Design a protein with these regions (language model features):
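Extracellular/virion structural assembly segments
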Residues: 1-205
Length: 205
């Protein structure tokens, strides 16, 4: 692991992709047959705001060099994804054990019994795992508990009382390209060069 992406490098644009390789064929009768051959992971295309080497890009260049192309992993917290749309603010935990492959997860510890404790599209992680999951249905709690539907299916088992992280979500990722280019897009009136950087990362499983 080679650290956390510099917080001073603010995003200008963000593209989110979900990768899930699927083989599809059809029977003689025309019925679709499908199977998935590897695990889902997220991918991002990110463009960093224009800035000078002295205030953003010096630190950013050094960080990217430390990654040694795709060799190292690092954490990144995309601003549009790191916090939930829901209203939950309490410590939420897994209720009971769950096995790999589950998509419905029992949780308890919700702060109140109302709708939209979590919202569809919110991201969560579980203690002991780095994989990020997306909640795919709005969550209403009852008796401070609820069943949450996630995608992709769990990669590994969950223990009872494992804590759920739903704010300040960190994705563990790696660069996907061997060549990383910092482009000069202009200069200030004082002659300082202005850089811009666009890069792709993929979630590391």
């Amino acid at each position: 692991m080679a650290g956390a992406f510099p917080s001073s490098a603010n995003f200008e644009t963000l593209g989110l992709s979900s990768i899930q390789n699927t083989i599809i064929s059809k029977s003689i009768s025309g019925k679709k047959l499908s199977r998935q051959i590897d695990n889902q992971r997220f991918r991002f295309t990110i463009k960093i705001i224009v800035g000078k080497r002295s205030d953003i890009y010096g630190e950013l260049m050094a960080f990217i060099m430390k990654q040694r192309s795709s060799k190292e992993n690092f954490t990144i917290s995309p601003p549009e994804l790191k916090s939930i749309r829901g209203v939950e603010s309490s410590t939420v935990s897994v209720n009971g054990t769950h096995t790999a492959g589950d998509t419905t997860i029992a949780l308890d510890g919700f702060g109140a019994d109302t709708a939209n404790r979590f919202r569809a599209g919110d991201m969560i992680t579980f203690a002991g795992q780095t994989k990020v999951y997306m909640i795919v249905e709005d969550v209403t709690s009852s008796s401070n508990a609820a069943t949450v539907t996630i995608e992709p299916p769990l990669r590994s088992a969950l223990a009872d009382d494992a804590v759920v992280t739903y704010n300040n979500i960190n994705f563990t990722v790696h660069l996907t390209n061997d060549v990383q280019e910092f482009g000069v897009v202009g200069a200030t009136k004082d002659g300082d060069l202005l850089y811009q950087f666009e890069f792709d990362v993929e979630e590391t499983l």
